[in-house]
Regions:
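Alpha-helical membrane segments and adjacent membrane-interface helices in multi-pass membrane proteins
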Residues: 1-57
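Short helix-perturbing small/polar motifs within transmembrane alpha-helices
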Residues: 37-86
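Membrane-embedded alpha-helical hairpins and interfacial helices in multi-pass inner-membrane proteins
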Residues: 65-142
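Transmembrane alpha-helix boundary and packing residues in multipass membrane permease domains
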Residues: 19-20, 55, 59, 89, ...
């Protein structure tokens, strides 16, 4: 998400595409130091695609000035997080043959691929959304 906010839509998406491609050819860039074609096309492939799409969307928002103020930057990063979760959980459900949602205690894509990470990811989105406007102010003041 930060790549999109800093680099803009096209460069942000390309940087995430490069990340996915380098991981797919075997570099240990993915979670827990994994990489390779199996990791890139497995159950978590949707999250990798989501990174690319989210970087593009957050980048577009940044190109329209939504990275300059706290009141617009944080929602942009939260939207990016939702995009990653939407694409990722959708693919996870498909790949594992799980329902997207389920009854409490029943396995679902949301319970396995969103719930365990939600608090940490929201905190990271809030932190990035708060830091980016401050960083731009620092950079612009230094000119």
């Amino acid at each position: 998400l930060l790549a999109g906010g800093v680099l803009g839509a096209n460069r942000g998406a390309m940087s995430m595409g490069l990340y996915v491609a380098l991981g797919a050819i075997g570099l240990p860039f993915y979670a827990e130091g994994t990489g390779g074609w199996t990791a890139a096309t497995g159950a978590t492939a949707g999250y990798l695609v989501g990174f690319i799409v989210a970087a593009f969307v957050v980048g577009k928002m940044a190109e329209h000035g939504q990275d300059r103020k706290l009141s617009t930057s944080i929602p942009a990063f939260l939207a990016g997080t939702l995009i990653i979760y939407g694409i990722g959980a959708g693919w996870l459900a498909y790949d594992l043959g799980l329902p997207l949602t389920g009854a409490a205690g029943e396995p679902s894509a949301i319970s396995l691929g969103v719930a365990p990470f939600l608090v940490g990811d929201v905190l990271k989105a809030l932190l990035a959304g708060a830091m980016l406007p401050a960083a731009w102010r620092f950079i612009e003041d230094g000119r």
